[in-house]
Design a protein with these regions (language model features):
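A short, structured loop/turn motif at beta-sheet edges
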Residues: 18-26
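Residues that act as N-cap/strand-start positions at coil-to-secondary-structure junctions
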Residues: 47-49
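Surface-exposed patches in mature extracellular/periplasmic domains of secreted proteins
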Residues: 28, 39-45
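C-terminal, well-structured catalytic/ligand-binding subdomain of enzymes
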Residues: 1-19, 51, 56-169
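A contiguous strand-loop segment
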Residues: 1-5, 33, 38
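Secretory-pathway/luminal and periplasmic proteins that interact with or process carbohydrate-rich
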Residues: 37-41, 62-64
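Short, well-ordered alpha-helical packing segments
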Residues: 15, 28-31
Length: 169
């Protein structure tokens, strides 16, 4: 952003996007103009807090925003649905490509609690979640309804890639 640009805090950045844009395309177009810069906080570790901002809309359009070395980087498209804390998003995508080419997605997946491994597992699992009523699972859902199956599937995905509270690498 230009010198002297307005500053907003890291914590208000998502709210700004939610309050001002109806679609991902609108948000991307406006944020590309870099009318402000996002001010981060310094954590107790002495490092600046980093954050990816991920948005999607009713059409399925998505975008991932992140600041890398002070510069806003935007990944825009329906394929950008998963993000973890680190590394930078371009590196997360490169790791995903490695696993696609290695054939690991259908045979084995990385299993550590590292963010990059969780990114690969989440991407794989999100791709295989049923988007329609699944005869395998529907009998175990309340009212045998997809409106219950879908959130149950998402919760099971989240639990399978989450790191237990208190666990440290």
């Amino acid at each position: 952003p230009p010198e002297g640009a307005k500053v907003i805090s890291l914590s208000t950045w998502p709210q700004y996007v939610l309050d001002n844009f109806a679609t991902v395309a609108e948000a991307v177009a406006d944020l590309r103009k870099e009318k402000f810069r996002v001010q981060t906080v310094v954590l107790g570790t002495g490092r600046a807090a980093n954050m990816h901002l991920v948005i999607s809309d009713a059409s399925g359009d998505s975008a991932v925003f992140e600041y890398v070395d002070g510069n806003l980087v935007i990944h825009h498209g329906k394929q950008y649905r998963v993000v973890t804390n680190s590394p930078t998003y371009d590196k997360q995508l490169a790791i995903m490509e490695y696993w696609k080419e290695a054939g690991g997605r259908s045979k084995c997946l990385p299993g550590t609690s590292r963010a990059a491994d969780r990114f690969v597992r989440t991407s794989f699992l999100l791709d295989v979640l049923p988007g329609v009523v699944s005869p395998t699972y529907i009998s175990g859902t309340p009212q045998q309804s997809f409106k219950f199956q879908a959130p149950m599937a998402v919760l099971s995905l989240m639990r399978s890639v989450g790191t237990p509270l208190g666990f440290a690498n």
